[in-house]
Amino acid sequence: AASQVTEVPNTIPHPAQDSALALARSVKQWGTPQYSNGYICRNPRRNDQMHHYDMNLCYIDELLWHLNWTGDLEYARRMWPVLTRHLAWEKLNYDPDNDGLYDAYACIWASDALYYNSGAVTHSTAYNYRANRLAALIAEKIGENSTPYHEEADKILKALNARLWMPERGHWAEFQDFMGHKRLHTAPGVWTIYHALDSDIADPFQAYLATSYVDREIPHIPVRGEGLKDEGYATISTTNWLPYSWSINNVAFAEVMHTALAYFQAGRTDAGFKLLKSSILDGMYLGESPANFGQISFYDAARGECYRDFGDPIGVASRVLIQGLYGILPDAMNERLLVKPGLPSAWLSASLHTPDIDFGFQRGDKEGVTSYVVTHRLPAVRTLELQFPAQRSKVAKLTINGKPATWTLVEKSITRPMLSVVVPASSGEETDVHIEWGGEEFSSPASVPANVAYAEAPVCFVPMQQDEMKWWYPVDRPQPEANQSLIEPSTFTQVHSAKCEPVVMDTRFNSSVTDIFRNEYLSPRSPYTTLQIPKQGIGEWCHPLHTVDINDAGLRSSVQNGILNTELGIPFRTPAEGHNVAFTSLWDNYPDSLEIPLKGKASRAYLLMAGSTNHMQCHIDNGVIRVYYKDGTCDVMFLRNPDNWPPIEHIFFEDGLAFNRHTPTLYRLRLKTGEISNNFGEELGFPGASRELDGGAAVLLEMPLNPGKKLSHLVLETLSNDVVIGLMSITLQR
């Protein structure tokens, strides 16, 4: 709070990008939207030192948790100006179009190399939802106007559900593009899932669904070691994105722990505990510094085990223990303590002692009796709510401190019924809840009826009732990826050289492939301050001046009479001099799309292509090729990173774990030498996950066609922001 800027009004309008750093990030100048009142500087008690991270969101979230635990309204009153300045600053900078969805500017651990180009981002928006919702509560408690904060929180939640929640997929998008086609990026990192749950934007169904996305799509890496019994332990990577860049796809202890917390918050206690235990075994038991919290895991393919005594995992591990496993959730500003234990279903007993709370749990072997004992020492708390899972279909008897008491069912309980008891409980008072169970064990649904919840999602929920208990039972319903066609791998197993005929497309060439990173891509760009791709079309805000020299000398020297004869038996027409690529892009430098006439009939089209992509354009269609026939129909092949669209400067690192393309390795043509291989990664001896190729490489693709139809033309269109997609040659197999 003492590092917050208070005397620097915003006098310089959006956008305020740093021209010396290739427009990738905000210029460090007082008076810009970012470096003005409300901004929290990095160093303690210094509000005159700029830095490049948005530390505001994390600090304010910690402050609000402090108030949740203490209920200290006098301190809340002192901090009120800090909170309101922060919220105004976030709105000015990251929701300048006032749509309720916020850009993210280096505001989480995985900030390095993340950039959203003024997009609508789930994790930062979730942070702002919680901050506004609790600001409204604080305002009510201290006599300030709560209306603006209620309205903003409602607006945010409505926008999140309308635009970023994907019901057919059962999770939020990583972000929605502000520029271009305003598409959703549908493969979020774990930070999207855990921040959403941590900031309370999810209902119980959404919480379960979102964590099941982690089960299905986030890479799981087995945790094994000498002397460790193999019980299915596994840690996770933060994303499934390629190519590698620091903080984009890592195995980081804090990220794993926070995801474990999300499982507990979703009520998936066994899964949460398994992930928590896996991470502890990985770092604190099998690691090189036993009992220590490091930053990066041994299982991280890029960095390996590194850093000691790291604050991020220490803090999050504390939260997953207290708030997740033991479910201690103070709401002290409302004089309330919620205890919602996340204990594994196999545990028969557990206890916890901290300066704030004592907790005890006992369960009989036959699930006939359960008891919970809670004593808190939170001065502001007057009421205790205990939520716990039912063990059988009836409650025969429930007492609190020996006296009969009432209970209620928790609405939207998933997997098993949850019960709630509420009792007055001031600091130091022991509350002993004793339950004797009756009835029967719980059954599973025999079939999936029509009246399920979230029927379109990969998991649906069946309403269940058994005696006194009601709950929802999750049923997996795997579905194909929505709105994404299957991309057939290019294996080149059906090449017939004698039937191959190169297409003459010389008049469509508009550049040389070597120009791709020598250009300046200046428009269109966001009208707001943001993190974005540097003007040379490669790099990111941490490496804004990075570039790669694309060198096609080997390709050109291999051309004979305008033809490149390849080892695959495919001849490609390409010039030895002059322009040799037809680029398309959403940048104004090149057309969004182009058309190339075709003639006759063909069974396949072989394509020599080259262009750019990056981790922010992973698992989304970067472009599309449409081959039209004379009858007006067309065949379509999407160009998707990493399936069949690689960055010109990179060879994908693949390990079958965190870096897994789930498709055969691509054939690449090394531009500097003219060599073709689908194994350059090993042949050239790259030492790690970063495989930047000297001179760059084109990619060879094949597209099956209908041999019975006459061809009309081919259209290449770029769909993604950031990227440039180039067609260098087409060969038809008649």
Please give the residue ranges for each predicted region.
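Aromatic-rich carbohydrate-recognition surfaces in CAZymes
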Residues: 1-100, 121-129, 186, 190, ...
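Non-catalytic C-terminal accessory modules of carbohydrate-active enzymes
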Residues: 258-462
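Extended, well-ordered alpha-helical scaffold segments
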Residues: 15-31, 73-91, 131, 135-163, ...
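Conserved, compact domain cores that house catalytic/ligand-binding motifs in diverse enzymes
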Residues: 1-16, 456-488
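Conserved small-residue packing positions in alpha-helical repeats and bundles
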Residues: 64, 136, 194-197, 260
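N-terminal/edge-of-domain interface segments
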Residues: 480-734
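Short strand-turn-strand beta-turns centered on an Asx-Gly dipeptide
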Residues: 72, 399-404, 630-631
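Extended glycan-interaction surfaces of carbohydrate-active proteins
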Residues: 1, 20-51, 88, 92-120, ...
